[in-house]
Amino acid sequence: MPASSPDGILFRMRLLLCIAGMVLLLGGCATPDFNGVVLDPPDPAPALALTDSTGAEFALSGQRGKVVLVFFGYTHCPDICPTTLLDWKKVAAELGTEAESVRFVFVSVDPERDTPAVAQRYAARFDARFTGLSGSRDQIDAMLRQWKLAAFRDGIPGDTAPVYTVSHPSQVFVIDPEGQLRLMHRAGLTPAQISADIRALL
């Protein structure tokens, strides 16, 4: 069948339309490029069975429909904790009204010094919309096991000095509106990059 014949031209037009349809289909299924580490496949986020400053238990299940950022630290942290929350403050400002669909959660892993009220005051120093959580030592340890994370007091075992540092995770965990753990944000991302990831999940 000559390519210039009516049948040949019709065949080529059908082929081009088919290819165009496939391109549109694949484009519609494309996933956004993220700046954070993608957790694939995503898993349901572990529970945060901890207490807020009002004495109520904080439940991730109650945050459905929102993107939730979770960071584990402590209020006496000299470096990455204030840096992370300051970045969050900039992210919230950059998101504008979209920040209403985001929950920023600071979890203290130093319950000996950080009560829920102390954790909340610390988080609110950066932005009144931020949530600070803590709990008993048993609650914190159980939560860390669920998240498969570790945090421990630095120094000599048994040391009871009131001034100490705590080794803890440095990454931020990002949970999508369906409650799935989707991303990890490592140190070094800019507020603009963090905001872009949040917008891609909203």
Predicted regions and their residues:
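Bacterial N-terminal signal peptides that target proteins for export
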Residues: 4-17
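Bacterial signal peptide processing site
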Residues: 30-32
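Short loop/turn microsegments at loop-to-beta-strand junctions
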Residues: 45-46, 68, 169-170
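A short beta-strand-turn-helix
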Residues: 48-68, 92
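Short active-site neighborhood of thiol/selenol oxidoreductases, capturing the structured segment around
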Residues: 61-84, 88
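Thiol/disulfide oxidoreductase modules built on the thioredoxin-like
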Residues: 139-197
